[in-house]
């Protein structure tokens, strides 16, 4: 999340702290002036007026995020039956058997998808010529050594069709995986089919496709299951034999040019009497159509490098930086007449101490900044010598709201960075 937004959130948090904290003269609860947000740890939980003032601060925050100066005046609410019917028709929420509305959290799902996409790597591996004719060898990059969950894997092949010969309109292309395997121990899976055994060597049908043989173009063959099996077995190479029995009849040919094959064909081109300039241009064009494997993969949920340090939950047993749960029910504060959904707001906040040894340990955008500042602060370098590390939000999630405006219109608004999910030391 942008650092600028976090600073703005910090200011809002400080306002809540000031409103909820006792006066500076109160004994035993003085706020630290050089770290205002740290004063949340000293918030007097037993003072009767502290809870209402926190709620008032939350109210103002919600109105501000909805760009409202005051709560809408709902003098003539829409009949319940009409409201529920409209919600069903517009697919903006689900209506439970008890009549309560449950808003569809599309923005939350999108945030989860975006987070997943950020953790996904895409690797393109160009083919090398295999040991046998019409075979290709793919060596998956070391970049993917920590990736164990395949999202998508495809082999791309270029079919070249001469303009003069277009007798056949369709051809079938098959991809076979070649591997050494003890007999009787093959795991064929859904995508592969065992088609032949020669001693300890086996061939599995990876993919098959009927393609148009009237024009030169790329064709894509899915091999996700096969690559997943390779990764599960701790392997990183794939040997593929390409078969196209009807290609010769149609005059079409698959470009299977790899580094080894290029060297082998250099001599053949000269023997055929082709000019070096023309042969070089043809080879360069062929290389632009070199087969490749496209892999999208991510680390598994239980991978040790993927486990990010999670923020602590305040449970009364810890005094270091943690997330404090604070739920405000819209029914309890009299706002359920204009807010249709959700039923309340998780106004979580951060509190606790930030000792020097944990500053900058959170997996947030603040971590690098915090670690550098802490490095200089511990060594007494100006201007960081007198700074204290503060407990601040490091991860926030969006919130969707369904509510009435002053004109009795139903509004659905997605509000970014509304709910504190994790806290860390800045």
UniProtKB/Swiss-Prot annotation:
Biological processes per GO annotation: activin receptor signaling pathway; androgen metabolic process; androst-4-ene-3,17-dione biosynthetic process; autophagy; cardiac fibroblast cell development; cell differentiation; cell surface receptor signaling pathway; cell-cell signaling
UniProt main location, coarse: secreted
Glycosylation sites per record: 165
Protein name (Swiss-Prot/TrEMBL): Inhibin beta A chain
Signal peptide: 1-20
Subcellular location: Secreted
Domain of life: Eukaryota
Region (Disordered): 259-288
Record-level Gene Ontology MF annotations: cytokine activity; growth factor activity; hormone activity; identical protein binding; peptide hormone binding; protein-containing complex binding; type II activin receptor binding
Organism: Homo sapiens (Human)
SMART domains: TGFB (SM00204)
Gene: INHBA
SUPFAM superfamilies referenced in this protein's UniProt entry, alphabetically: Cystine-knot cytokines (SSF57501)
UniProt keyword annotations, A-Z: Cleavage on pair of basic residues, Disulfide bond, Glycoprotein, Growth factor, Hormone, Secreted, Signal
Function: Inhibins/activins are involved in regulating a number of diverse functions such as hypothalamic and pituitary hormone secretion, gonadal hormone secretion, germ cell development and maturation, erythroid differentiation, insulin secretion, nerve cell survival, embryonic axial development or bone growth, depending on their subunit composition. Activin A is a homodimer of INHBA that plays a role in several essential biological processes including embryonic development, stem cell maintenance and differentiation, haematopoiesis, cell proliferation and tissue fibrosis. Signals through type I (such as ACVR1B or ACVR1C) and type II receptors (such as ACVR2A, ACVR2B or BMPR2) which, upon ligand binding, phosphorylate SMAD2 and SMAD3 intracellular signaling mediators that form a complex with SMAD4, translocate to the nucleus and modulate gene expression.
Quaternary context: Dimeric, linked by one or more disulfide bonds. Inhibin A is a dimer of alpha/INHA and beta-A/INHBA. Activin A is a homodimer of beta-A/INHBA. Activin AB is a dimer of beta-A/INHBA and beta-B/INHBB. Interacts with FST and FSTL3; these interactions prevent activin A interaction to its type II receptor. Activin A interacts with ACVR2A. Activin A interacts with BMPR2. Inhibin A interacts with ACVR1; this interaction creates a non-signaling complex (NSC) that inhibits ACVR1-mediated BMP signaling. Inhibin A interacts with ACVR2A.
Effect listed in the UniProt record for changing residue 280 to E: Found in a patient with early-onset epithelial ovarian tumor; uncertain significance
Residue ranges annotated as propeptide in the record: 21-310
């Amino acid at each position: 999340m942008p650092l600028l937004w976090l600073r703005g959130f910090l200011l809002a948090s400080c306002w809540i702290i000031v409103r909820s904290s006792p006066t500076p003269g109160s004994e035993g609860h003085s706020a630290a002036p050089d770290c205002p947000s740290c004063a949340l740890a000293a918030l007097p939980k037993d003072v009767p007026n502290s809870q209402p003032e926190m709620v008032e601060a939350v109210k103002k925050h919600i109105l501000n995020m909805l760009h409202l100066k005051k709560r809408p005046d709902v003098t003539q609410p829409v009949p319940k039956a009409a409201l529920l019917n409209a919600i069903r028709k517009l697919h903006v929420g689900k209506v439970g058997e008890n009549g309560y509305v449950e808003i569809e959290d599309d923005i939350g799902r999108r945030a989860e998808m975006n987070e997943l996409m950020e953790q996904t790597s895409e690797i393109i591996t160009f083919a090398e010529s295999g040991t046998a004719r019409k075979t290709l060898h793919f060596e998956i990059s070391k970049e993917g050594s920590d990736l164990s969950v395949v999202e998508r894997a495809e082999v791309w092949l270029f079919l070249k069709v001469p303009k003069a010969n277009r007798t056949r309109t369709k051809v079938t292309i098959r991809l076979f995986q070649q591997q050494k395997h003890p007999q009787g121990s093959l795991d064929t899976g859904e995508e592969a089919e065992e088609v032949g055994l020669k001693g300890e060597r086996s061939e599995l049908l990876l993919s098959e496709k009927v393609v148009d043989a009237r024009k030169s173009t790329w064709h894509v063959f899915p091999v996700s299951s096969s690559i997943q099996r390779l990764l599960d077995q701790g392997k990183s190479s794939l040997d593929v034999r390409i078969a196209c029995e009807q290609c010769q009849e149609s005059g079409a040919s698959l470009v299977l040019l790899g580094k080894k094959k290029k060297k082998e064909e250099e001599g053949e081109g000269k023997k055929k009497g082709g000019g070096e300039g023309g042969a070089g241009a043809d080879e360069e064009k062929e290389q632009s159509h070199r087969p490749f494997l496209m892999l999208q993969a991510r680390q598994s949920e239980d991978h040790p490098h993927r486990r990010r340090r999670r923020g602590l939950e305040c449970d009364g047993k810890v005094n270091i930086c943690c997330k404090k749960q604070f739920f405000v029910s819209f029914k309890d504060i009299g706002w359920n007449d204009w807010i249709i959904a959700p039923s309340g707001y998780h106004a979580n906040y951060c509190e606790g101490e930030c000792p020097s040894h944990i500053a900058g340990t959170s997996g947030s955008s603040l971590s690098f900044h915090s670690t550098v500042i802490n490095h200089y602060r511990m060594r007494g370098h100006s201007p960081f010598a007198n700074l204290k590390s503060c407990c601040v939000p490091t991860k926030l999630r969006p919130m969707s709201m369904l509510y009435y405006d002053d004109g009795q219109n139903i509004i659905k608004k997605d509000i970014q960075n509304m709910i504190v999910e994790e806290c860390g030391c800045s």
